[in-house]
Amino acid sequence: GSTDNQTMFFSGQFNYNNTFNDVHNLSAMLIASGFQQSKSGQYHKNSSANLAFDASYNYAQKYYADFGLAAIHSAQLAPGHREALSPSLSLGWRLKNESFLKNSKVVDDMMISVSGSIINEDIDLASGDNRYYLYQSIWTSDYGYGWYDGSSDKYTYSKRGENKDLDFIKRKELSLNFKTSLWQRLVTLDASFFINSMEGYLISSPTFYPSHLNTGYPSASFMPVLNYNNNRRVGFDFAANFNKKVGDVDLSLGVTGTSKATKRDENNVEQYQNRQGKALDGIWGYKSAGLFQSEEEIKASPDQSYFGGTVKPGDIKYVDVNGDNKIDQYDQVFLGKGGWYGAPFTLGVNLTAKWKNFTFFALGTGNFGAWGVKNNSYWWVKGDSKYSAVVRNRWTEETKETATYPRLTTLNGNNNFQTSDFWMYKTDAFRLAKVQITYDLPSTLFQKTWLKGLSAYVSGANLLTISGEREVLE
């Protein structure tokens, strides 16, 4: 059958610009916008209404101030919580226009600025595909078996508790910026230090509620949806460019870098398992202590039957972190950053050389500080699956002193195939991401044609990887 999708949108904008006494520069902007989208088969229309104001002022192109304020409305929240204000403020100082730098032959431009904002957003207010009425409780009914044959009883139970105080997710940002140009743009630099915090992500099964408020069968819960989890990103980024003409060749070398730490707030039963203060892309698993060498060593070690099967010599030995003489999920710890939200430090280097109608361009990228886990079918050879070359270094009685891979078995080998530091490797790498040579045909060839220009180029991508784990990464 057919479906209907209707979107109505409105936007209006008012701008103001003026200069007073040649030194006071003022501009302002007022924006109103809204939209409503309705789809067949969906009860609730997707609506948004926003009003924003921005005012900018600078004195003699030296001192800058910018203030913004957005008023937003969201139908995803309960009445009384659907409106919010999102302010922002930026302050800047252009040092180049001060008397002590105005006539400098070294500094072309130099500016420092600081900015901060608190943004209320509802984009992430969702539980699965459900975005509306998350603040309401849900009750439902079902049938179950009665106490006597041939009958069933109807019962009513809660699926979710009520929370009419559910609020917007807040994005708090603070940044300090520095920009400069030196020696007639021979060197340019743009650097920033930033702190970004996302506060109030939704959770529906918080660990600080008693477990009896949530049951597995029937799937009942009195727990409401709460604003609870917080994510924080702290770091710096920079971009430096060097531009020089050497004879007939125009050279440009650029270097960019980003370093950041991402952290989460979350509670767990064991304190060392708390995600609070740990990386958002953290790898969690077991600490290994080598391979078991004998039955006597297994008997003298904490019980590892949690993973199933029988532990034998050649299996991975794990560390009993909480000291309860057994290995289970409560012995998992933070092992390192996975780099899924970006490596702790990323680097980019680009080189451009222009000579007559030829242009040479090369781009190199690097990422450092993250870890990976060797957990695909090449490394985790289970049961009678096809073996890879890595198992040549497996544990046997003859190779126990040099083995780098656990024993082989056609039975349950789950003990060995758990996320642990035994399988981890550094993903540090520098890659020659792109090389391109371009030739621009002379413009004189197109003076009497409809063509404005024509270029031909040859390029290559991912031509080289420099890494201690190059074979794994490739």
Indicate where each model-derived feature is located.
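Extracytoplasmic gating/loop element in the C-terminal half of outer-membrane beta-barrel translocons
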Residues: 282, 313, 367-455, 459-460
